[in-house]
C-alpha cells in the first residue's frame, strides 16, 4: 500500500513538472507550489527544506548582472567578444562556445549568454559554416560555465554544508575539477560538431532559402554591426566593478581564513560562502550602478533580471516540491533505492540528466 501511495505522489509531482514546463516562465514555480499544497494538505507530508541560500544567491548575482546590463557593461562585453570572434571567423565552432562558457563562468548565470548567440549565428553564417555547429555547443557551454563559476548558485549549493561542504570540499576544489573538465568537454564537443552537416555553400536547402529571400545574410550582418557599434562611456567602469566583485568572491573562496569570524555562544564561526557571495554581489551591484551611472528602473526591466527572477520563482516551487516529496518518503527511499544507487552511482547522474530535461534547467 505504501509503495502505491508513493508512486501516486510521484505521478502527481511529475505531472505538475510537465504542466509547469508547458506553461513556462513562473509556471514552474506556481505549479510546483500546487504540488507542495497537495503533498502537505492531501498526504500530510511535512514541508521540505527551502533552498534559501540558492535563491538568495540567484537574487544577488542576477541583481549585479542586471545592473551591469543597465549600465551598458553587458553590451560592452558582447562587443569585445564579437570583435574577437570576427578576427577568427573560421574557428567560430570552437571559439563561440568557449567565449559563451567564459561569460557564464564569470557572471555565474547562463542568462548573460543570450546576447552572444545571435552574434555567433551571424558570424558562422557569413563564414559559410552551419550555425547549428557553434550554437548547439554554445548552449551547453553556458550551463557548463555555471558548474565552475565561483558566483553561481549551483557552486554555492555544492559546497554548502548539506552537500560536499560537510566533506571539507570547498570552492577551490570545485573550480579545480569543473573548470578544466568543462573546458576539455567543450573542445571535444566542438570538434565533433565541426563535422556535422554540410557547409552552407554546399547545402541546397540553405541556398534555396537565400534565393527566395527567406534568409538574408547581408541584412543580418548589418543589424549585428549596428548593435555592436553602440557604446556607453561608463560601461567599462561597470564591467570592472562587476569583475571586482567576482575577484573578491574567488579570493574569499580560496582563502577562507580571510573571511570575517564571529563569536556566537562562545563558539567562533566563519562567514559562510553563500553569505559571502550574497553580500559581495549585492554590494557590487551598488558599485556598478554608481560608477556606471545606470538607471535602476532599466535594471529591473532588462532581460537578465526578468529571466533570473523567473528562475528563482521556478526553484522556489519546484525545489520545495521535490524536497517535500523525497524527505517525506525518506525511509522508503533508504530501504528500496539507496542500495541500488550505492552500487551503481551513475544511475544518479542519469536521473539528474532526465530531470534537467524536464525542468529545462541544470
Give the residues covered by each predicted segment.
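Hydrophobic transmembrane alpha-helices of multi-pass small-molecule transporters
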Residues: 1-65, 205-325
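Transmembrane alpha-helical segments of multi-pass small-molecule transport proteins
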Residues: 9-12, 98, 174, 280-283, ...
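Alpha-helical transmembrane segments of multipass membrane proteins
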Residues: 16, 100-103, 145, 181-189, ...
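Membrane-embedded alpha-helical segments and adjacent helix-loop junctions characteristic
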Residues: 19-21, 31-34, 40-41, 45-129, ...
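Juxtamembrane transmembrane-helix termini
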Residues: 69, 195, 199, 255, ...
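Membrane-core helix-loop-helix motifs of multi-pass transport proteins
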Residues: 121-217, 223-238
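Membrane-interfacial helical/loop segments at transmembrane boundaries in membrane proteins
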Residues: 160-164, 260-269, 334-340
Amino acid at each position: 500500500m505504501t509503495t502505491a501511495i508513493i508512486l501516486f505522489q510521484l505521478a502527481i509531482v511529475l505531472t505538475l513538472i510537465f504542466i509547469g514546463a508547458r506553461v513556462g516562465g513562473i509556471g514552474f514555480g506556481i505549479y510546483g507550489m500546487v504540488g507542495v499544497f497537495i503533498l502537505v494538505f492531501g498526504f500530510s507530508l511535512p514541508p521540505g527544506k527551502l533552498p534559501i541560500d540558492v535563491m538568495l544567491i540567484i537574487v544577488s548575482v542576477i541583481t549585479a548582472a542586471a545592473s551591469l546590463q543597465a549600465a551598458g557593461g553587458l553590451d560592452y562585453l558582447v562587443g569585445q567578444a564579437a570583435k574577437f570572434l570576427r578576427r577568427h571567423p573560421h574557428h567560430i565552432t570552437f571559439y563561440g562556445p568557449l567565449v559563451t562558457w567564459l561569460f557564464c563562468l564569470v557572471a555565474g548565470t547562463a542568462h548573460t549568454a543570450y546576447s552572444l548567440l545571435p552574434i555567433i549565428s551571424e558570424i558562422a553564417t557569413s563564414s559559410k559554416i552551419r550555425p547549428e555547429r557553434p550554437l548547439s555547443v554554445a548552449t551547453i557551454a553556458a550551463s557548463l560555465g555555471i558548474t565552475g563559476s565561483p558566483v553561481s548558485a549551483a557552486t554555492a549549493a555544492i559546497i554548502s554544508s548539506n552537500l560536499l561542504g560537510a566533506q571539507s570540499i570547498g570552492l577551490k576544489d570545485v573550480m579545480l575539477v569543473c573548470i578544466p573538465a568543462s573546458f576539455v568537454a567543450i573542445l571535444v564537443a566542438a570538434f565533433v560538431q565541426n563535422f556535422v552537416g554540410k557547409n552552407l555553400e554546399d547545402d541546397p536547402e540553405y541556398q534555396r532559402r537565400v534565393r527566395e529571400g527567406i534568409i538574408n545574410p547581408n541584412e543580418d550582418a548589418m543589424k549585428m554591426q549596428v548593435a555592436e557599434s553602440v557604446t556607453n562611456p561608463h560601461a567599462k567602469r561597470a564591467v570592472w566593478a562587476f569583475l571586482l566583485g567576482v575577484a573578491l568572491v574567488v579570493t574569499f573562496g580560496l582563502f577562507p581564513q580571510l573571511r570575517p569570524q564571529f563569536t556566537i555562544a562562545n563558539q567562533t564561526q566563519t562567514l559562510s560562502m553563500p553569505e559571502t557571495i550574497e553580500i559581495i554581489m549585492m554590494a557590487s551591484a551598488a558599485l556598478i550602478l554608481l560608477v556606471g551611472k545606470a538607471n535602476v528602473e532599466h535594471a529591473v526591466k532588462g532581460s537578465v533580471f526578468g529571466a533570473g527572477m523567473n528562475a528563482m520563482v521556478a526553484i522556489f516551487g519546484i525545489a520545495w516540491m521535490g524536497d517535500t516529496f523525497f524527505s517525506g518518503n525518506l525511509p522508503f527511499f533508504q530501504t528500496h533505492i539507496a542500495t541500488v544507487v550505492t552500487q551503481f552511482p551513475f544511475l544518479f547522474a542519469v536521473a539528474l540528466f532526465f530531470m534537467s530535461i524536464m525542468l529545462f534547467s541544470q
